[in-house]
Regions:
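Acidic/polar loop patches that form or flank catalytic/metal-binding clefts of enzymes
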Residues: 109-110, 131-135
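Extracytoplasmic/periplasmic beta-strand context in beta-sandwich domains
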Residues: 38-39, 84, 108-109
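Sequence context of c-type cytochrome heme-c attachment sites
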Residues: 44
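Low-complexity, flexible helical/coil segments
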Residues: 105, 136-137
Length: 138
């Protein structure tokens, strides 16, 4: 089990200040129409202690201070909804999404959900128009 610390991540311009660097990946054809609510590259909480309702947001129990850069992410297909290309999920804080290319079909290019101090810089998004043939949940 990886233990993440909040000691790093104070300086987004210094890659050595991040706990995890996700770099130079080619992520493609993910989801393939069999699942929902996912990301090509996703950061998120490990459990209920990271639900944003406690002081645990920036403690080692949460996936924080991740630098996602220089990745190519393309073509994600959900079953019903929510194929997110770059996805910072619940309470994932202090992350930097930089110099990524997002291309093709999917739902949303970049999502920051309920975290603190997440940044997006210099990302290129090229989306093809795709018809939405699914019903929206109500």
């Amino acid at each position: 089990m990886m233990v993440l610390s909040d000691e790093k991540g104070k300086n987004h311009d210094d890659p050595d200040e991040f706990v995890i660097n996700v770099e130079y990946n080619y992520v493609h054809d993910f989801g393939v129409g069999i699942t929902n609510d996912f990301g090509g590259i996703k950061t998120g909480s490990k459990g209920p202690q990271c639900d944003g309702g406690t002081e645990a947001w920036l403690e080692e129990r949460c996936y924080s201070y991740i630098r996602v850069y220089n990745n190519l992410v393309r073509d994600g297909w959900p079953y019903l909804c929510c194929a997110n290309f770059l996805y910072s999920d619940v309470s994932s804080s202090g992350n930097l999404f930089q110099n990524n290319i997002v291309h093709g079909s999917g739902s949303v290019a970049l999502v920051h959900h309920c975290g603190l101090d997440n940044e997006s810089r210099n990302n290129i998004v090229h989306r093809e128009a795709q018809p939405d043939n699914h019903q929206v949940w109500s």
